[in-house]
UniProtKB/Swiss-Prot annotation:
Keywords: ATP synthesis, Cell membrane, CF(1), Hydrogen ion transport, Ion transport, Membrane, Transport. It comes from Listeria innocua serovar 6a (strain ATCC BAA-680 / CLIP 11262). The keyword Zinc does not apply. F-type ATPases have 2 components, CF(1) - the catalytic core - and CF(0) - the membrane proton channel. CF(1) has five subunits: alpha(3), beta(3), gamma(1), delta(1), epsilon(1). CF(0) has three main subunits: a, b and c. This is ATP synthase epsilon chain. InterPro entries: ATP_F1_dsu/esu_C_sf, ATP_synth_F1_dsu/esu, ATP_synth_F1_dsu/esu_N, ATP_synth_F1_esu_C, ATPsynth_dsu/esu_N.
Length: 134
């Protein structure tokens, strides 16, 4: 089986550069598994985990939106934000989740921006999920 050159980049810089045998990402249309030789595509990403099948096992990256471009043996992910599992501070992520849940509760009571509170909660849960996958 061949391999893919994978790049995950945010506005703050590169998060992951490496080789993978498979990339699994959740797009707006559903989950996609990308193998070498995949048809070229561009797809918007949801807030979720990007799983990279590598020789040593699997690496998880918490991605908070963006786009994935597949072209030949190249997979480029341009993410709003992204963190590798080993870079996630679980205490900070848990606190962010708690703040987002409180904000969501207030949003429902006070009719303030519920959408922003839901997005903050999704991002926090996504980071926790990435960190705890092992």
């Amino acid at each position: 089986m061949g391999s893919l050159n994978v790049s995950i980049v945010t506005p703050d810089g590169p998060v992951y550069e490496g080789v993978a045998q498979m990339v699994i990402a959740r797009t707006k249309a559903g989950e996609l598994g990308i193998l070498p030789g995949h048809v070229p595509l561009v797809a918007p990403l949801k807030i979720d985990i990007v799983r990279l099948k590598v020789e040593s096992g699997e690496e998880w990256v918490a991605v908070n939106g963006g786009f994935m471009e597949v072209n030949g043996e190249e997979v480029n992910i341009l993410a709003d934000t992204a963190e590798r599992e080993q870079d996630i501070d679980i205490d900070r992520a848990e606190k962010a989740k708690q703040r987002a849940e409180e904000e969501l509760s207030r949003a429902k009571e006070q009719k303030v921006d519920e959408v922003m509170a839901r997005l903050a909660l999704q991002r926090a849960i996504n980071r926790i999920h990435a960190k705890e996958h092992n």
